[in-house]
Regions:
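N-terminal secretory signal peptides that target proteins for export/translocation
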Residues: 1-4
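Bacterial N-terminal signal peptides
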Residues: 8-19
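Extracellular/periplasmic catalytic domains that process cell-envelope and extracellular macromolecules
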Residues: 32-34, 61-63, 80, 156-161
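A short beta-strand-turn-helix
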Residues: 23-37
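Short pre-active-site segment immediately N-terminal to redox-active cysteine/selenocysteine motifs
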Residues: 38, 43-46, 161
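Structural alpha/beta surface segment adjacent to cysteine/selenocysteine redox centers
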Residues: 45, 51-127
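C-terminal cap of thioredoxin/glutaredoxin-like
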Residues: 123-223
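Alpha/beta-hydrolase fold active-site loops
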Residues: 37-38, 65
Length: 223
């Protein structure tokens, strides 16, 4: 019980600090159709903290039965993150699960990947999943344009780091949101995220969810 109380006290303090220090504005984000609450994350496939968070996002979101919406935010100082994001989008076109699995695969092997060997890792994943890679995965730049649109959205929201994680509620505009500011302890991060989802569900409980349509959301846990 003492340990639980300490964690609870620390959680409240962290949430308060996060609310006070948050610089990003998630009010322009929207939940996907059919969802009252969603976890929305701006990620960079070369970011170590994104790798730590990736499985946690799906674990907590699945437990609360809310979708995860992934936004690409490749940082300029990372030499291969944009290329990896293009391939992630390519695998998304094959199936949502394949796109999720590719991201999980990249995050898992991130310490061994560099600009010079990225293509080898991509080819290995494609071979293991029996997906033939075309000579050019994005010949017209359409996948890159989607990535740049996500990055522009993040820039307008005032993002300063990855991952930037929001719990967003249906409503508005502006949409109700909470930014999750991570701490070193991932168990505490899980608790923070779960609490933010529960709080948002209470906040928007009486609001009707938007009608379902096809959208790019990610609900299953990545491998």
């Amino acid at each position: 019980m003492i340990r639980f109380r300490n964690v609870a006290f620390s959680l409240v303090a962290t949430l308060t600090l996060a609310a006070a220090c948050s610089a990003a504005d998630g009010s322009m984000l929207k939940t996907p159709p059919g969802a009252k609450v969603a976890v929305e994350v701006f990620e960079d496939l070369e970011c170590p903290d994104c790798a730590r968070w990736y499985p946690v996002l799906f674990e907590v979101a699945n437990a609360h039965k809310v979708p995860v919406v992934l936004h690409d935010f490749p940082l300029p100082m990372h030499p291969w993150s944009l290329d990896a994001a293009v391939y992630a989008r390519f695998f998304d076109t094959k199936s949502q699960k394949l796109g999720e699995d590719f991201r999980g695969y990249i995050y898992k092997n991130q310490p061994s990947i560099n600009k010079g060997n990225l293509q080898q890792w991509i080819q290995k994943f494609a071979d293991e999943n029996k997906v033939p890679l075309p000579f050019a995965v994005d010949p017209e730049g359409k996948l890159k344009a989607l990535i740049m649109a996500d990055r522009d959205l993040g820039s307008r929201a005032g993002l300063q780091h990855t991952p930037t994680i929001f719990v967003v509620g249906h409503g508005g505009p502006p949409s109700p949101y909470t930014e999750i500011n991570e701490v070193q302890d991932m168990e505490q991060n899980k608790a923070m995220l779960g609490q933010a989802i529960e709080d948002m569900e209470k906040k928007v409980g009486s609001v009707a969810a938007p009608k379902p349509t096809k959208t790019r959301t990610h609900k299953k846990k990545a491998s």
